[in-house]
Structures are given as structure tokens and as C-alpha cells.
């Protein structure tokens, strides 16, 4: 399976471990970054993962930031994405079987790597169970998505990147 993976600078090592694990399981990975610990922001990488999945370049996605909250919210803004922030196998399976989630998010500083791998395995093994009720819920959720023209601009994050270059952000 082709899986897009992305993270922010806080959890780069955790993302690398997930990528390595998925490769050992025979999956093809689209590594959307980030690739080091240089300060950045999660929306950039959530957007990249979301676009890879929504375009069909990847079948599913995994996003990771410190708590998982920010990057999961960011990836959910990409039209066609249904992402779930998960911390256990039950939630991951539910998100796939009932809501047809195509991205899962993790808090890399909240959950350990081995558990994260187990949850990813459970998510990948789960299959969407289409029912009339599930289809209605998904249609309702999807109807809430409206892409803005600004979002398609390749310079969408430039103002923030310029601030980082000027040293205006501090951890």
C-alpha cells in the first residue's frame, strides 16, 4: 500500500521510526516531511499529506505532531480528507470501518512508538463497512468542506515562513 506520512519538527524522529516500520511491512512511503528538527509548523505537512491522499498519489495517510491535535486539524481542512486523531486501536478501527477515514493522526509525544505501530497496523487492516447510515454521515461531513482559492496558492504559507527566517518564532 502507498502511504503518505508527515510531521512537524517536534516529532521528526518518531516519524522516521514510523516510516522505517511501514517499509519493513512492505508499504511504499511518500515522505512529506519534515526531515529535520528545524522549527516549522504542522499545517504545511498536514496539507502535503492531505493533498497526496486526496489526489490519489497515496491510498492513506499518517500525520504526527506533538499532541496530534494541530496536524490532524490541518489535514482535515484538505477537501476529500477524513482524518481521525487516534490513541488506541478501537478508535482507529472505528474511524476506518464506520467513517471511512483515510488519514490518522498521532501525538508523537503522547503515544509510544510501538503502540503507534500497532494502531497503524489495526487501521490498515480495517475495512470500510458501507451502510446507508455511514454513507449519510460521510455525505454530511463531506458537504462541510469548501476549498478556498487561497488554499491552492503555492505561496499559502509564505508569510509564516518569512517570519521564521526573521527569527520571530521561538519554542
Curated annotation (Swiss-Prot):
Pathway: Carbohydrate metabolism; D-galactose 6-phosphate degradation; D-tagatose 6-phosphate from D-galactose 6-phosphate: step 1/1. Gene3D superfamilies: Sugar-phosphate isomerase, RpiB/LacA/LacB (3.40.1400.10). Keywords: Isomerase, Lactose metabolism. The keyword Isomerase applies. It catalyses: aldehydo-D-galactose 6-phosphate = keto-D-tagatose 6-phosphate. The keyword Nucleotidyltransferase does not apply. One of its GO terms (biological process) is pentose-phosphate shunt, non-oxidative branch. Pfam families: LacAB_rpiB. It comes from the Bacteria. Its EC number is 5.3.1.26. It is an enzyme of class 5 (isomerase). One of its GO terms (molecular function) is galactose-6-phosphate isomerase activity. NCBIfam families: PRK05571.1, PRK08622.1, rpiB_lacA_lacB. Belongs to the LacAB/RpiB family. Heteromultimeric protein consisting of LacA and LacB. HAMAP family: LacB. This is Galactose-6-phosphate isomerase subunit LacB 2. It comes from Streptococcus pyogenes serotype M18 (strain MGAS8232).
Amino acid at each position: 500500500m502507498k502511504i503518505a506520512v508527515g510531521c512537524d519538527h517536534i516529532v521528526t524522529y518518531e516519524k522516521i521510526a514510523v516510516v522505517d516500520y511501514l517499509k519493513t511491512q512492505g508499504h511504499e512511503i511518500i515522505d512529506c516531511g519534515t526531515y529535520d528538527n528545524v522549527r516549522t509548523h504542522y499545517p504545511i505537512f498536514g496539507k502535503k499529506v492531505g493533498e497526496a491522499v486526496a489526489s490519489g498519489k497515496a491510498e492513506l495517510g499518517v500525520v504526527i505532531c506533538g499532541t496530534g491535535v494541530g496536524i490532524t486539524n490541518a489535514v482535515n481542512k484538505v477537501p476529500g480528507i477524513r482524518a481521525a486523531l487516534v490513541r488506541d486501536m478501537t478508535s482507529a478501527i472505528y474511524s476506518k470501518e464506520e467513517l471511512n477515514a483515510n488519514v490518522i493522526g498521532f501525538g508523537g509525544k503522547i503515544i509510544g512508538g510501538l503502540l503507534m505501530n500497532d494502531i497503524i497496523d489495526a487501521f490498515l487492516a480495517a475495512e470500510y463497512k458501507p451502510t446507508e447510515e455511514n454513507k449519510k454521515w460521510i455525505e454530511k461531513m463531506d458537504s462541510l468542506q469548501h476549498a478556498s482559492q487561497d488554499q491552492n496558492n503555492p505561496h499559502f504559507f509564505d508569510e509564516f515562513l518569512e517570519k521564521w527566517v526573521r527569527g520571530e518564532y521561538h519554542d
